[in-house]
Regions:
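Short Pro-Gly-centered flexible turn/kink motifs
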Residues: 78-83, 89, 152, 193, ...
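A contiguous, surface-exposed recognition patch within enzymatic or periplasmic domains that forms
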Residues: 2-46, 78, 85, 92, ...
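Extended, loop-rich substrate-binding clefts of extracytoplasmic carbohydrate-active enzymes
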Residues: 43-81, 129-188, 217, 303-332
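Acidic, contiguous internal or C-terminal segments within carbohydrate-active enzymes
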Residues: 67-69, 81, 87-105, 165-216, ...
């Protein structure tokens, strides 16, 4: 058959993603790894990490109002197909490559999640497992992983259809594009990626293509390397492969805990990674040299890791991840020069190698056998030539726009036109006026009319902006009295906070509160008070904000966490009684109630909540709050009832006699002997 691109529907049970959180993510804790506290990280990687990480995820907001109730849903997909492969992309969910079927054998090369179930694993909170995710800009999954990208049909000179996925990334302020295509007769899916830095200065850059493949006991991950960086979220070290401490770490079935292996592929060597099963068959990923990093992630065989696999999907659908990135590890950023354009070509196909060699005891022979078969599948010279041919279509305008993404790229295009700046992208990326929506509407008014419009205070604000150019426009408008309303002051406070002008932010939010008594300004002022150690004021402001919007779950959760952190559990329990049942019955709220109850010695309430088996929809990756609460509860209960101190002996006894029930165990490391207290 001839290569084709078509639009279809993919049906699966899906949880509701819910609306975005209207609260700006001012507090960046938990967004990024605290790498400075992890031993073994090389100095140069640590420096690029510290220099490259933003203080928070602004201007993005969190996607944290999803549920775990699933219902049948049809997703819009793009399908690329030729005689060898059929590739399916979820257009509404970050352009995720969801399925890649090798047609002659009928083999699915990726792990296809049978459900869409968001969980709290990404910077914006919501993330889902399965397929191939395109991660740009910052560590912690793409800001677009649960959002629609622009999608367009482009055609090569020979008529081969190309699926172009693209967006404007707002933290690094760069456009990126993904051109996926399947030429006639190709046994490999090609994915050509381009990132452009349109600025006059350097930009910290990050890209990782994360590939989920089925996990089986006999699947082995191979790459052309004799050593790796190992990162288990507690330490960072170098180990030899395949064996470390007597264990063959290239099989996930041998690894007890979650962790990453970053392969040391020599400079100049062809970068690839593959996961053949016991028959020597599985996905192989290869690229041109720009995409130099390769990583193997697994959840581990521990109870917590197994629980996470089920939490993200359904029993029996476990996966591991093969990943490919610009840098050698994910603990670093590369400095992208001013005006630079970075491009590379990725290939995805079926590896068929000799299983006896692939799973043999000679590691070098094992990976060399895969490399030999890769050279037959897609020779290195052929991949390089295919990449060079991409210059012919990379700037070609779309034949058809299949889907629009956000309106932020169009707004940036209009701002640049108004200020006389050069365009940030070629005609190959269309950010049209039709993509502009409610989030961009007030900023468009500011740009064209010089005034910021107001909306009703009871409507959830959205459309955050932190760029200096927009702040200057808003500062000028407000100082001149053009739209100095509650919403303008609210946004200006966020901009000042982002620019580390805390006093200015406080004044702006106080002005917003004078204009309208909103939970939005009260909450932002509460964050400032908490950060400054003005706890009495923070409690008062948080309680006021919650009373103004008692049905807003993210506000209630943040309020509960903060009041407990400040040592005010009784204030939280008192406020909890005022919240509506739709909030009080949520699993996260139940966890916070139990933590507060334990803090005041109310063992009966803690026991009742555990008996209700709360499900915390937004359990964070690496979070141990449930298991810590379980251990702390039993330690304190036994200490009181038996009049004994909480010491190492009691902690050990609790872990023996009261193991964490499976539904509460999300631990990713083997530190069961430690306690939160």
């Amino acid at each position: 058959m001839m290569s084709e691109l078509r639009i279809e529907r993919w049906s699966m049970p899906a949880a509701d993603l819910g609306p975005e959180d209207p609260l700006p993510p001012l507090r960046g804790e938990g967004d990024f790894l605290d790498l400075e506290k992890i031993p073994g990280v090389p100095d140069e990687k640590l420096k690029s990490w510290v220099d490259g990480n933003p203080p928070n995820i602004l201007p993005y907001t969190r996607q944290n109002r999803f549920t775990r109730q699933r219902h049948p849903r049809d997703f819009r997909i793009a399908v690329l197909e030729n005689e060898f492969l059929c590739a399916t992309f979820l257009l509404e969910l970050g352009g995720r490559l969801w399925s890649l079927v090798h047609k002659p054998s009928g083999r699915e090369l990726l792990q296809v999640n049978p459900v869409f179930q968001p969980a709290n694993l990404a910077l914006r909170n919501a993330w889902f497992s399965g397929g191939v995710e395109w991660n740009i800009g910052i560590y912690g999954h793409s800001p677009f992983t649960c959002s629609a990208l622009f999608a367009a049909r482009v055609e090569r000179s020979d008529g081969t259809p190309i699926l172009r996925l693209y967006e404007w990334e707002r933290i690094r302020q760069v456009p990126f594009q993904i051109d996926a295509y399947l030429p006639d007769g190709s046994p490999v899916l090609f994915v050509r990626v381009r990132i452009v830095n349109p600025h006059d200065g350097e930009v910290p850059m990050y890209w990782w293509s994360n590939i989920a493949v089925p996990e089986t006991p006999d699947t082995r991950v191979l790459a052309p390397a004799g050593s790796t960086y190992r990162f288990d979220y507690r330490k960072f070290d170098v180990i030899s492969v395949p064996k470390a401490e007597g264990i063959d770490v290239t099989y996930s079935s041998n690894r007890t805990r979650a962790g990453d292996l970053f392969f040391h592929i020599p400079d100049g060597h062809r970068p690839w990674i593959s996961a053949p099963d016991g028959e020597g068959k599985g996905l192989v990923h290869v690229s041109t040299e720009r995409l130099a990093g390769r990583k193997f992630f697994c959840w581990g065989m521990g109870l917590g890791g197994r629980h996470w696999q089920e939490f993200l999907s359904e029993p029996g659908h476990t996966y591991i991840e093969l990943q490919a990135g610009l840098a050698r590890t994910q603990m670093e950023y590369l400095s992208m020069p001013a005006g630079a354009e970075w491009s590379w070509l990725e290939g995805y196909g079926l590896m068929e190698a000799d299983p006896d060699v692939v799973h043999g005891t000679d590691w070098t022979q094992a990976w060399q056998s895969v490399e030999d078969m890769l050279e037959r599948l897609i020779p290195r010279a052929a991949l390089d030539a295919e990449f060079e041919r991409g210059a012919d279509f990379v700037d070609r305008p779309p034949v058809e726009l299949l889907q629009r993404g956000s309106g932020w790229g169009a707004l940036e295009r209009l701002r640049r036109e108004a200020s006389g700046e050069a365009p940030f992208c070629s005609e190959g990326l269309v950010f049209d006026a039709e993509s502009l929506g409610e989030a961009q509407s007030p900023w468009l008014s500011l740009l064209h009319d010089g005034a910021f419009p107001a909306f009703k205070p009871d409507v959830e604000p959205h459309g955050l902006m932190v760029r200096a150019q927009w702040r200057a426009l808003l500062e000028d408008a407000v100082s001149a009295g053009r739209g100095a309303n509650w919403l303008a002051w609210l946004h200006l406070g966020v901009m000042r906070y982002y620019a580390r002008d805390r006093d200015g932010a406080r004044r702006a939010w106080e002005m917003s509160l004078e204009e309208a008594d909103t939970p939005w300004a009260a909450r932002n002022l509460a964050v400032l008070a908490w950060e400054d150690g003005r706890f009495d004021e923070a409690v008062e402001l948080y309680v006021a904000a919650c009373r103004l919007r008692p049905s807003l779950l993210p506000l209630a959760v943040e309020c509960g966490r903060t009041l407990i952190d400040m040592g005010r559990p009784r204030d939280w329990l008192g406020l909890l009684a005022e919240l509506p049942p739709s909030v009080r019955t949520v699993g996260r709220i139940g966890l916070l109630e139990a933590q507060a109850a334990l803090a005041i010695g109310d063992f009966e309430s803690v026991q009742r909540i555990f008996a209700e088996k709360p499900v915390v929809d937004d359990m964070r990756e690496g979070e141990k709050s449930l298991s810590h609460l379980w251990f702390d509860f039993h330690e304190q209960r036994l200490s009181v009832t038996e009049n004994i101190p909480i010491d190492d002996a009691l902690r050990a006894r609790v872990r023996r006699e009261f193991p964490v029930p499976k539904q509460f165990d999300f631990r990713m490391t083997s530190d069961e002997s430690t306690s939160s207290g």
